[in-house]
Structure formats: C-alpha cells, structure tokens
Regions:
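Conserved pre-ATP/AMP-binding loop-to-beta segment of ANL
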Residues: 41-43, 54-86, 93, 103, ...
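Residue(s) in the substrate-gating loop at a strand-loop-helix junction
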Residues: 129
Length: 241
C-alpha cells in the first residue's frame, strides 16, 4: 500500500537449513489484504517446487525473460528515487527509506575503493540479505557501480551443507574480500573450532574480512585472524551506533 508498486517479483519458495519456505501463499495473502492492487506478479519457479500461476496477472520469470528485448539505459535526474527500502520495524511500523540515485552512486562507489579496496574486475562477496541495507548496497548496487563481480549466495554459514560453505565459495570464485556479520563467524567457529574445513580449500586470493551489523567479540575476531591470516576489520554503521 505504501509504495504503490506496479509489479511484484517473487519466487515459488526459498531454502533454509532443513526446511523450505513457500513464498506464494505469503504473497497471495499480502495481495489479498492490501488496498492497492499490483498490475503483475512475476514469479521464478524453483526446480521441483513449481506452483500454479493465475493468468493474466501472474506470469513466470522464464516467460518474461524469454520474450525480452534489449533496451537502452534510461537517463534519470540525480535526485530521483533509486529505491525504497523498508526498515525491519524494530521501532514500530516499518518505514520506507528512500535513496536517491546520484548521491547513492557516488557514496557507494567511493566506499568500494577507499574502505574495501575493491577495484574493477575484483570479486567481492557481501554475505548478507538483499532485504537489508547491507545487501541492497553491497550485493546489488555498489559492485555494479564499481564494475566488479558480486557473489549472490543462498545459504547459511553452517548447515548448507556444512561449516565449510564460506570457504568453498571464496575458493571457487576467488573472492578478494568478504563483508558479513560476526554471527556468521561465531557459527562457523562453534561448528568447526579447529578449522578443519578451512584446510580443504585454496583461499590464496582472499585478502580481507570485514565485520559489521552487531558487536564483534574479541575472541571471534582473534579466531578469524589466526585462521585466515588476513586483516579482520571490525567496522560499524547505523545499527551499532
């Protein structure tokens, strides 16, 4: 109702350790309760978890992309909306935060080089959630503006499938720097305190670890430093302040 969205993009489901979350019933109920009605729902069918679509307002991602045509970039004014991101609601009703295009691009591109030392062609991984500001900023927009590769990972530090998941991703994609929450490393440390999974992978391209989003306890920082043998940088943003 607040954003007056025209199109809703979703998937048939998502995967959590040990369970599948069916998205379509949740989305259907939200549409039913909303006063504002969307024009279209575009749904990505997860393999083995396909759901029925109700034409003509619901269409599959594959159908849309198979008929897509190349279009030119659209020029916009620097103060136009890039997106509206809704807060988690920890202080009441979720509030829509508006980011403008010009200032956001300048700030994010600056941080990629000057905070994270990421250059064009590097591989960067922000192990966050796109629904959070870190994910929006550092999975989607900042890598795009900087011209580097971004890793999008569906899974957890442990349980998908094991405590070596992060090391495998870093090794497979030659990740230069990782930005994640201390909770992720606490979970890995709890499951594999001796770092046995770590020894199975080649992390020779990995240069730095950045932690934020909550307090990073000294024991976890020291454990990560000793295991990774790279700088572990505990920096903070609005949640911590």
């Amino acid at each position: 109702d607040d954003s007056k969205a025209k199109i809703l993009v979703t998937a048939s489901c998502g995967f959590e350790p040990g369970r599948t979350v069916e998205y379509k019933p949740l989305v259907d109920e939200a549409i039913k309760q909303a006063d504002h009605k969307i024009d279209k729902m575009i749904l990505f069918q997860r393999s083995g978890h396909e759901v029925k679509l109700n034409a003509p307002t619901e269409v599959s991602w594959d159908e849309v992309t198979s008929n897509a045509e190349k279009v030119d970039c659209v020029e916009m004014n620097s103060n136009e909306f890039a997106y509206i991101l809704y807060t988690s609601g920890t202080t009441g009703t979720p509030k829509g935060i508006v980011r403008d295009i010009g200032g956001h691009i300048v700030a994010l591109k600056w941080t990629m080089k000057n905070i994270y030392n990421i250059n064009e062609g590097d591989t960067w991984w922000s192990a966050s959630d796109i629904g959070w500001i870190v994910g929006h900023s550092y999975i989607v927009y900042a890598p795009l503006f900087k011209g580097c590769t971004t890793v999008l990972f569906e899974g957890k530090p442990v349980g998908t499938p094991d405590a070596g998941a992060f090391w495998k991703i870093i090794s497979d994609y030659k990740v230069k720097s990782l930005f994640t929450a201390p909770t992720a490393f606490r979970a890995i440390k709890k499951e594999d305190p001796e770092g046995k999974f770590f020894s199975k992978y080649d992390l020779s391209k990995f240069e730095s670890l950045f932690l934020a989003g909550e307090r990073a306890d000294p024991d976890t920082i020291k454990w990560a430093e000793n295991l990774l043998n790279v700088p572990v940088i505990d920096h903070w943003w609005q949640t911590e302040t």
